[in-house]
């Protein structure tokens, strides 16, 4: 009996303790729930505020002057390439031009080999320098005609048929720093030799350097199951190499005649048709609107050409301050500051109107130079109605428009050194004047 009584008391005590503990636990649980609910509410509110602030920041950060482009005409082109650390824009832009020509005519897409062209062209250029006893320039640069000459005389191969060797320093991009540091002194040593006669053995040595750094040009190769020589492959592309002409516009030679544009990289000295500026411009418009592209060579050293994919013929004297602040006088800004100001000003930037007289003045005083080669393939306009050429670059998928530049018509007309185009893209009335 006593045993059972003690047990009942113990049970009663345990029951009361259990109830007390349960009540305490319930209170703790409720308090925890309240705290968790409050924390969630605070986090949600904080998140909403952060989103609101982010949206506001984004809204504030949008530049109302940023160009918004509407395409007027866009012709098919091949993929964006990267010339990297090599002075081969002339090569990339012109091969890109011929790839677009093939695409237009045959609907086939090709990736033609730039280093095949370099290999052949640098050997030819070295031979000329030696023949001139060193009184000729030997450099990485070139002209659109160099590519056409190689296609006509040596042929071409697709990129896959000529693998690049050790020149790339472990990656897939061109790096001509070491290459030319080796090759230029070699060519100079032969060209400026004091010997009465020289042998042709030096060509074998130079060819070894070219092959080591650029890759060896194949004598034959297979492409899509068929064996070709480079000449046979070039013939199979469906183009007539005699269809291509070069156009320029200067007053120190008669209009509607040909002359070799006097720049150092035009070392083969081909003739370019000299036209009045307005007709030079009309050919570009006519070409693009009729499905053709244009291999353009010109000056991109101006502050109106940005690395973000925009080029405008800015009025530097008239644009003293793009913000209206006396602190930022345009002519005193650094190149980087000018680029930033241009980006900020966008479509509000005032442009100059190009003229024949200004083109000639800048050519004669070295302001207009042959800096770069690119491919014009389309026409677009911004929200103000200003028209631009759509231009493919060879600096990889860089800038605001992933390797494409929007270059105002005024900029292109003013800064053109010369360009290559299919003669069938020239308006009939101009062709008649040229007799082609």
Language-model region placement:
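Short regulatory "switch" loops immediately downstream of catalytic or recognition motifs
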Residues: 1, 104, 379-380
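Bacterial Sec-dependent N-terminal signal peptides
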Residues: 1-16, 20-53
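Generic marker of residues within folded, mature protein domains
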Residues: 37-40, 79, 107, 286, ...
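Surface-exposed, flexible loop/turn segments at secondary-structure boundaries
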Residues: 43, 97, 302
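Cleaved targeting-peptide boundary
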Residues: 51-61
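Active-site nucleophile-adjacent alpha helix/oxyanion-hole segment immediately C-terminal to the catalytic cysteine
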Residues: 64-238, 242-253, 259-266, 271-294, ...
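Active-site signature of cysteine proteases
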Residues: 204-436
């Amino acid at each position: 009996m006593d045993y059972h009584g003690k047990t009942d008391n113990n049970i009663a005590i345990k029951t009361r303790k259990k109830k007390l503990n349960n009540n305490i636990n319930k209170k703790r649980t409720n308090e925890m729930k309240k705290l968790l609910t409050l924390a969630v509410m605070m986090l949600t509110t904080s998140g909403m505020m952060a989103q609101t602030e982010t949206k506001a920041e984004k809204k504030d950060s949008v530049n109302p002057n940023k160009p918004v482009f509407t395409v007027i005409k866009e012709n098919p082109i091949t993929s964006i390439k990267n010339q990297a650390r090599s002075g081969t824009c002339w090569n990339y832009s012109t091969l890109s031009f011929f790839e677009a020509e093939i695409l237009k005519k045959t609907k086939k897409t090709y990736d033609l080999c730039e280093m095949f062209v370099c290999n052949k062209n640098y050997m030819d250029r070295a031979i000329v320098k030696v023949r001139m006893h060193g009184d000729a320039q030997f450099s990485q640069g070139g002209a659109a005609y160099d590519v056409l000459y190689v296609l006509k005389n040596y042929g071409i191969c697709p990129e896959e048929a000529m693998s690049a060797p050790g020149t790339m320093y472990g990656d897939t991009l061109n790096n001509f720093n070491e290459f030319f540091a080796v090759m230029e002194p070699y060519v100079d040593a032969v060209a400026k030799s004091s010997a009465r006669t020289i042998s042709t053995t030096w060509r074998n040595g130079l060819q070894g350097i070219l092959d080591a750094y650029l890759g060896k040009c194949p004598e034959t190769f297979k492409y899509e199951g068929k064996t070709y020589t480079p000449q046979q492959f070039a013939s199979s592309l469906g183009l007539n190499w005699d269809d291509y002409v070069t156009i320029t516009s200067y007053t120190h030679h008669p209009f509607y005649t040909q002359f070799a544009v006097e720049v150092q990289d035009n070392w083969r000295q081909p003739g370019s048709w000299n036209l009045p500026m307005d007709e030079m411009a009309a050919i570009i418009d006519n070409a693009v609107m009729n499905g053709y592209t244009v291999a353009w060579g010109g000056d991109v050293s101006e502050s109106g050409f940005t690395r973000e994919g925009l080029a405008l013929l800015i009025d530097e004297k008239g644009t003293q301050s793009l913000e209206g602040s006396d602190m930022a006088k345009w002519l005193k800004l650094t190149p980087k500051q000018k680029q930033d100001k241009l980006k900020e000003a966008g479509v509000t930037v005032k442009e100059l109107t190009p003229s024949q007289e200004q083109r000639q003045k800048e050519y004669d005083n070295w302001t207009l130079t042959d800096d770069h080669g690119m491919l014009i393939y389309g026409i677009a306009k911004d929200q103000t109605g200003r028209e631009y050429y759509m231009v493919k670059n060879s600096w990889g998928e860089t800038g605001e428009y992933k390797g494409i530049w929007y270059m105002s018509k005024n900029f292109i007309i003013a800064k053109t050194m010369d360009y290559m185009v299919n003669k069938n893209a020239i308006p009939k009335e101009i062709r008649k004047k040229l007799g082609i």
